Amino acid sequence: MAEQEQRKIPLVPENLLKKRKAYQALKATQAEQALLAKKEQRKGKGLRFKRLESFLHDSWRQKRDMVRLRRLEMKPHALELPDKHSLAFVVRIERIDGVSLLVQRTIARLRLKKIFSGVFVKVTPQNLKMLRIVEPYVTWGFPNLKSVRELILKRGQAKVKNKTIPLTDNTVIEEHLGKFGVICLEDLIHEIAFPGKHFQEISWFLRPFHLSVARHATKNRVGFLKEMGTPGYRGERINQLIRQLN
């Protein structure tokens, strides 16, 4: 019977074993520190107490919304579709704490979850109805080609695989919008400014625009109204606001 050859187990150098052990100990320490930091962060947050005035204000807001929306149902005098305008730009300029659920859902459908954000919307009867629902919290109007171009060039960002990327590469635009005939930034600007049958897909490719508002204006109501103006429809005067906040 042939003798079986003994297989030699390769020896690991002692210095390499020490390095591995030190590395594993370091990773364990880092994981423990991260866990402790997370617990401390949770402790630091604590409970958030809401003042009685806030509850009263939210209740008043909900009642006001209910009355306003009921009036819209009884007398749905929607704005007439303009002949020469097919594009609107909507900016959210008010907080929505305590508003009705319908207003919250409509704000979400318009992708205006953050205050001082804006989106392009195609002028249709359905969209005009949505704008009437959220009218006390947004301002909107009809942007011209210059405003569309300036917004997209300065603040345009795209949504690609749940990531936000700047519109600096035409290959990205062609890759995602080429099937709609949009292969460069100029094509995208044209398709937004003059809405066509693929406006929905192209506009949703863009992230909502985050406008620049002075900090003092957000804290000072008088300064805020002076800089932003009041909510509601403002027609072509939206172009002045875009240039002011872009």
UniProtKB/Swiss-Prot annotation:
The lineage of its organism: Eukaryota, Metazoa, Chordata, Craniata, Vertebrata. It comes from the Eukaryota. Keywords: Phosphoprotein, Ribonucleoprotein, Ribosomal protein. The modification Phosphoserine is found at residue 54. InterPro entries: Ribo_uL30_ferredoxin-like_sf (IPR036919), Ribosomal_uL30 (IPR039699), Ribosomal_uL30_CS (IPR018038), Ribosomal_uL30_euk (IPR005998), Ribosomal_uL30_euk_arc (IPR035808), Ribosomal_uL30_ferredoxin-like (IPR016082), Ribosomal_uL30_N_euk (IPR012988). GO terms for cellular component: cytosolic large ribosomal subunit. Belongs to the universal ribosomal protein uL30 family. This is Large ribosomal subunit protein uL30-like 1. GO terms for biological process: maturation of LSU-rRNA from tricistronic rRNA transcript (SSU-rRNA, 5.8S rRNA, LSU-rRNA). GO terms for molecular function: RNA binding; structural constituent of ribosome. SUPFAM superfamilies: Ribosomal protein L30p/L7e.
